[in-house]
Amino acid sequence: MLQTKSNNSAADLVCDVLVVGAGPSGIAAALELQSTGQTVVVIDKAFFPRDKCCGDGLTTGALRILDELGFDPQTVPNWTVCSDVWLRSPSGSEMQFALPTKGQFAAIAPRIELDNALVQLARSKDIRVLEGHEFVSVRELTSNHITIDVSSNNKIETVQSKFVIASDGMWSPVRKSLGMSTPGYLGEWHAFRQYANNVTGVANERLIVWFEKDLLPGYAWSFPLPNNRVNIGFGVVRDGKRRIQDMKDVWTDLLQRPHVVEALGPDFVMEDRHTAWPIPARVDEAVTGSGRVLFVGDAAMATDTLTGEGIGQALLSGSLAAEAIIQGGLPVEVRNTYAQAVKLHLFADHRMSLRLSKILAHGRGARGAIAIVSKSGNWGKRNFARWMFEDEPRAIAFTPKRWHRKMFRLKGPYQS
């Protein structure tokens, strides 16, 4: 790697892999690559810590990858482990689903803290993370390397690498620069989120999911944080029937519903303003690579179309992209390796989620599904909770290539 003018400068850098975007998918890729001796540079237009509109929930799948990457939950001040899940059916009935106790199977981690901790982990591994550096364009693409222009302090700098991993979000500037954007694309989900404090009801310690009839197949949530705070929000599918402009009214109404007020307590206080974000969830249609560029996370539209959750998919896709580069070969071979890995690990789960989403789109389907699980006994409830939080891939029963000896018997992440 060439010397630079400062630790936060990209001036004339040369590296093996440039990662555009320092979110979970980008840092996961960087950590995997660095562990095999690859020189990696990560750029991000933001300065950390920075907030990210998100529900902050971590599934078992996400926790397992974080554990494998050597991430320490203690570096996130408000990390909250959840031991069970509470679901409310459209009929109003509530059910508790216990998670296994050996290890962590669900956790809440504010993204402003989680993403910053991941960046610091990368730096502790001698990965150069350049903040305030924004991708501008692809300057040159040859048979040996790719060169991009980066903007920092109103100056254009260049970075040359063998590959670029674009972890730069749903509206990926890298994808756009390659002429691969989809005009007018607004994602498959849309979500609202806000923090609340002075929560004195049961929500201050429960992970709650409300299946509201008017939100199906979407849902509302309240995820607990320390000091009587929660992350509360809702997500809906973009089905052409809902006007996103009306979501603010839905939000106001949701916070006044008796069961929500009861869960939060009478004196809860909403913090700052609400934030909203679109969620891409069609990984089976996404182009995962072009030339010497691989797309990961939201840039690969890799979120769960059933829940809108994306941190686990982001971490997984970043790791898969890194593994494809490590395996080596010509750019077309690397792209194909990554595309096949994404297909193996994400396509079947995506299609399963689509089918389930259709069932949950109607009150009768949601009520019936929850009723069946509620009558399945402790074993059924516990394993449903593990399945819901992706302890195993959602469609693993139908994808024999992913079967393993410890299927459904894996130890929990962060098991002391």
Language-model region placement:
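Beta1/beta-strand and adjacent pyrophosphate-binding region of the FAD-binding site
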Residues: 9-25
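C-terminal helical "tail/cap" subdomain of flavin- and related membrane-associated enzymes
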Residues: 323-416
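Predominantly flavin-linked oxidoreductase catalytic cores and closely associated redox partners
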Residues: 121-262
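A conserved beta-strand/loop capping segment in the N-terminal third of enzymes
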Residues: 63, 67-117
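Glycine-rich FAD pyrophosphate-binding loop
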Residues: 31-54
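Conserved Rossmann-like nucleotide-cofactor binding loop
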Residues: 25, 48, 171
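FAD/FMN-dependent oxidoreductases across multiple families
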Residues: 78, 240-324, 330-332
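Conserved N-terminal glycine-rich FAD pyrophosphate-binding loop of Rossmann-like flavoproteins
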Residues: 47-67
